[in-house]
From Swiss-Prot:
This is Elongation factor Tu. GO terms for cellular component: cytosol. It comes from Limosilactobacillus reuteri (strain DSM 20016) (Lactobacillus reuteri). Its EC number is 3.6.5.3. Residues 61-65 are annotated as: G2. Residues 137-140 are annotated as: G4. It is an enzyme of class 3 (hydrolase). Residues 82-85 are annotated as: G3. Residues 175-177 are annotated as: G5.
Length: 396
């Protein structure tokens, strides 16, 4: 048993999820995958009802229902998320409660692409999911193969419309329900789908391989040694002697060298993504660095004031606003570790935004912030979270 434990950790880890229109079979497919892989000793079979009764979670103050299942193929370990309701799915994507490296788009061959199919593809594009594999479900209910071909073409066109490689995206046809009921042919289809996912969705770059970045949470002075910035390393690694830049909240970028590194009050040789560390900085005084800035590998991140965001606006029940907002609304945007006031401009044709809406708008921040596409933020008003978003485009 102990050996197996060790083996499991050596497989590369990938996060995926099922997306698509309501009742097209996302949860049935999730259950079928666990059942078929369980028969090979690679998963624990999860019941449809268990997946569907997803527990509530809080992410950045927003309540989301999400089911998490895990399973393995010969090559990889997967964490798979399935969000039962459409609103849950939207919230999941935007808050980053479930970071997806790739997604399985489930489309019922009986219906073809529906409104939420389009919406989920758009969201996947906005939040940076780069790889989509299509499962054409319920093909057993369509007598005419040409109709299935037609649906496949429609799905490919739709993916191309949102800048996915529609012509190259793998499409697998089958029946998730039949596989779940034990039909041997359809069980083979599920195994084929997993092979396709293994091959098509690349193993993500580990956070430690990316350029160093740490949002600053706190700054203090150690007498006789200098200024320490503390925080959780977001990505990359850092060691004594590394050059870093202090970026954000001002137009100036300061350079410094790391002269000491501590974790849990012990010295550290190498800090890596996920570690909470204190970084001693050469030649930096206490008033030259503040919470909300980031320490980063030189040249790896810039400040911006204007961006486009994909946003979920919380409902009154979730603790959000009770009333709509309009262009020129000026809440605080919480990035990394600090609030910055920004002015919202709604897109043409959108007069106002209601609590519960999912919307794309542009923001002009009062101060420059270290921003990049894919960065998550919350929107706050008087200390309360009223929405969550992700940077979908930089505009300056």
């Amino acid at each position: 048993m102990a050996e197996k434990e060790h083996y499991e950790r050596t497989k590369p880890h990938v996060n995926i999820g099922t997306i698509g229109h309501v009742d097209h079979g996302k949860t049935t497919l999730t259950a079928a995958i666990t059942k078929v892989l369980a028969a090979k000793g690679l998963a624990k079979a999860e019941d449809y009802a268990d997946i569907d009764a997803a527990p509530e979670e809080k992410e950045r103050g927003i309540t989301i229902n999400t089911a998490h299942v895990e399973y393995e193929t010969e090559k990889r370990h997967y964490a798979h998320i399935d969000a039962p309701g459409h609103a849950d799915y939207v919230k999941n994507m935007i808050t980053g409660a479930a970071q997806m490296d790739g997604a399985i788009l489930v489309v019922a061959a009986t219906d073809g692409p529906m409104p939420q199919t389009r919406e989920h593809i758009l969201l996947a594009r906005q939040v940076g999911v780069q790889y989509i594999v299509v499962f054409l479900n319920k093909t057993d209910l369509v007598d005419d193969d040409e109709l299935v071909d037609l649906v496949e073409m429609e799905v490919r066109d739709l993916l191309s419309e949102y800048d996915f490689p529609g012509d190259d995206v793998p499409v697998v046809r089958g029946s998730a329900l039949k596989a779940l009921e034990g039909d041997p042919e359809q069980e083979k289809v599920i195994l084929h789908l997993m092979d396709v996912i293994d091959d098509y969705i690349p193993t993500p770059k580990r956070p430690t391989d990316k350029p160093f970045m740490m949002p600053v949470e706190d700054v203090f002075t150690i007498t006789g040694r200098g200024t320490v910035a503390s925080g959780r390393i977001d990505r990359g690694t850092v060691k004594v002697g590394d050059e870093v830049e202090i970026v954000g909240l001002t137009e100036d970028v300061l350079k410094s060298t790391v002269t000491g590194l501590e974790m849990f009050h012990k010295t550290l040789d190498l800090g890596e993504a996920g570690d909470n560390v204190g970084v001693l900085l050469r030649g930096i005084s206490h008033d030259q660095i503040q919470r909300g800035q980031v320490l980063a590998e030189p040249g790896s991140i810039q400040t911006h004031k204007n961006f486009k965001g994909e946003v979920y606006v919380m409902t009154k029940e979730e603790g959000g606003r009770h009333t709509p907002f309009f262009s020129n609304y000026r809440p605080q945007f919480y990035f990394h570790t600090t609030d910055v006031t920004g002015t919202i401009e709604l897109p043409d044709g959108v007069e106002m935004v209601m609590p519960g809406d999912n919307v794309t708008f542009t923001v002009n921040l009062q101060k420059p912030v270290a921003l990049e596409k894919g960065l998550k933020f919350t929107i706050r008003e008087g200390g309360h979270t009223v929405g969550a978003g992700v940077v979908s485009d930089i505009l300056d």
